[in-house]
């Protein structure tokens, strides 16, 4: 076999392998569609936070990069905690550390669109809070993306979990 024939044979083999791999992904995608959540309505959330997009939030595809959404979750939750006076990010003895986050995407958003984050609390534990966050185009009826964000509250110095302070507990209960 010539070098050109070897190269052509290898390319066909790689293409066959690619097709098989893609077929496996397609099968997984079909199963995933069954369990895929739908966009959430505004009524699912208890509080709304206005958010600004930045030029650097867009990626090469012309929409907000997926990692930006997790940053928006973090900003929205912490902005509300600070505004409510239940989190002192500079001097408070108790701080929230993110231990889990995730997101489902439904439609594209891009700079310079104004956004809103809808906030709700899904679960309150002894030392943790599970938030649900929806990202909306400003005024939209359904989420463009929604996800979860879990804080474990810890002592600032020791970084050991502590029970939720009373004021924080009252605030997050109002978001359930």
Regions picked out by a protein language model, each given a short descriptive name:
Residues 2-8, 12-47, 109-111, 121-176:
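HotDog/MaoC-like acyl-thioester-processing domains
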Residues 50-54, 104, 150:
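Generic structural detector for well-ordered beta-strands
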Residues 53-55, 70, 96-98:
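Residue-level recognition of hydrophobic positions within alpha-helical transmembrane segments
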Residues 66-77:
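Conserved N-terminal beta-strand and adjoining loop/helix that marks the start
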Residues 72, 80, 84, 171-175:
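Residues that form generic nucleotide/phosphate-binding pockets
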Residues 80-129, 143-147:
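Hydrophobic beta-strand-centered segment that forms part of the acyl-chain substrate-binding groove
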């Amino acid at each position: 076999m010539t070098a050109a024939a070897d190269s052509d044979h290898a390319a066909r083999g790689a293409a066959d392998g690619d097709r098989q791999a893609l077929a496996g992904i397609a099968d997984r995608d079909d199963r995933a569609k069954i369990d895929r959540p739908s966009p959430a309505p505004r009524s699912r959330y208890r509080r709304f936070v206005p958010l600004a997009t930045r030029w650097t939030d867009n990626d090469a595809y012309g929409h907000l990069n997926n990692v930006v959404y997790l940053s928006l979750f973090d900003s929205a939750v912490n902005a509300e905690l600070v505004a409510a006076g239940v989190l002192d990010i500079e001097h408070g003895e108790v701080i929230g550390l993110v231990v889990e986050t995730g997101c489902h995407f439904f439609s594209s958003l891009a700079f310079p669109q104004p956004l809103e984050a809808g906030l709700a609390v899904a679960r309150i534990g002894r030392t943790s809070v599970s938030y649900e966050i929806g990202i909306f185009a400003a005024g939209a009826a359904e989420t463009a993306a929604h996800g979860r964000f879990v804080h474990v509250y810890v002592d600032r110095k020791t970084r050991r979990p502590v029970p939720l302070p009373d004021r924080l507990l009252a605030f997050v209960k109002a978001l359930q």
